[in-house]
Each structure stands twice: as C-alpha cells, then as structure tokens.
Amino acid sequence: MTTEPTGIAEFVKYPTEGDQKMPDHKIVDLDEWTAARNELLVLEKELTRRSDELAQRRRGLPWARINKEYTLQTAAGPRTLAQLFEGRSQLVMYNFMFGPDYEAGCPVCSSIADSFNGVLDHLKDRDVTMICVSRAPIEKLDAYRRRMGWNFPWASSFESDFNFDFERSVRKETVAGWFDGDVPAKEIETLTPREAEVEVPARFAADCGTDLISYLAERPTLSVFTLSDGDVYMTYSTTARGLEVVMTYYGILDRVPSGRNEGEPADPSWMRRHDEFDQTRAV
C-alpha cells in the first residue's frame, strides 16, 4: 500500500481572499446562443455515456474480503463492521477528517457532509446505508454533529486499527517524513497563529484546533462495502478529486459563469463550516 500523502493534502493551498470576478464573455443573440448550446450538448451527452460506461466498470470491480474483525464505537454503543450495515447489504462510508487531536472537524469534510442528511432515506430505499467514520472519540463526534445539525450515523475508530489498516489514517511519524528536506516537522508543529494563516495547509489544521502533522494524518476517503452471507467485502474506494461526487456544490458551481473560482492550481480555501460563513457577504 502507498504511503504518499493523498486526499485533502493534494489540493489544499491556503489563500489570500479576493473579490470574485465575473469572466468576460461574448454577447450574442438567442439564436447564436442556442447553436453554441447545442454544440456543447453533444459533448455533454458523450460525457454522460462515458460516465455510464465507467460506472458499470466500477460496479464490476472484484471484491476484497475483510477477514479481520473490527469494532467501532457509535452513539448506540460498540458495533462490528457488519453491524454498521443496519440490516442492509451495502454500506457507503465516508472517512471524515476528525482525528483524536482535533477540536473540530475538517472544514472541507464538513462542507461535504452537509449534503448527507438529505440522501439517507433515498439510499436506504436502495438497500444502502451511509455512515461517516473518524478517529476522534465518539463524544467529540456527537458534540460536533449536534453543532452542525446532522443526523447521519457517525462511528469512531478511536481504539481500532481500522483507519490504519485501510490507510484512512497515517502514523504521525510517517507524515513527518513527508517534510524531510523541506519543512522540519518540529517547526510545523510550532507554527504561530500568523504563520498558520498562510502556511499550506496549516490554516485548515488551525481551524480544526490541531497541528499540521495531526491534520494530515487523516485522509478523506469514500469507500463502499457489501455484506454477503455474513462476510464483509470492500468493493470500491476513492479519494482526492474522486470525492467530488459527494461535493454537490461543485456540480452546481461548474454550471455558473464564474465556475468554482478557485484559481490554478485549485484553492478551496473559501470553504467554511456552514455556521462560519460571513452572513452579510452571503446575502
């Protein structure tokens, strides 16, 4: 298995905030616009067909049997991996970046999780249970879930090897090694608040109330498991830009003139927890 940094660490580059600017566009009459739209529609339909083909191949991946027993903590008590399915045969699991040393969940993961409440019943009707898993103790997770107003199931792997076995988390000494010859780990862990405002991705670490190494030790991952004849199998997993499928706001922003407006390379520093946005600016 790889030990390279993946996930949030790949695309977090902390910002200097600026006013969003509307790009210049050619102005045409409705007939010319319709012609241009129809040209784009051909490409969109091709992409849809390719996406359907890819989804079929994704479903056709071989299954990996999970032979080790894992027990995670939930608000209702300890649960085995099989029990997390809640009587269904398919389990979608989002590894939410919230380590034991965090005081709050990752802002990017929080923005993703905002969409989970609304899909739970729809997924249950399709024989799918959706759950988040983090390494923070269950008490921290429950308190944060109440703050955010979420009701999806959330399990703690605090005293389990689960995250490490599946590389949803990385040992701190491994993370420190990523900075050898670049930024000494001891300096990263002693960033001043001012340095944390501009260091990449120290701002998100500071937002979580933790140090950079502890922040990067957690990896956002979307995984799928199935339960068949009492055995649990992993059928799919993705991270980094593969997570955009659950970042619903991106699908909407990709269709407005200003787009994601994150620059090059992509800089998602605008993301906040939903109770932290400047409401006057939002209006």
Task: Give the ranges of each region predicted by the language model.
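Non-globular targeting/processing and membrane-anchoring segments
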Residues: T2-L91, F96-R126, A143-G149, P153, ...
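Residues at the C-termini of beta-strands that transition into short coil/loop
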Residues: S134, S156-F158
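Catalytic nucleophile loop
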Residues: K124-L141
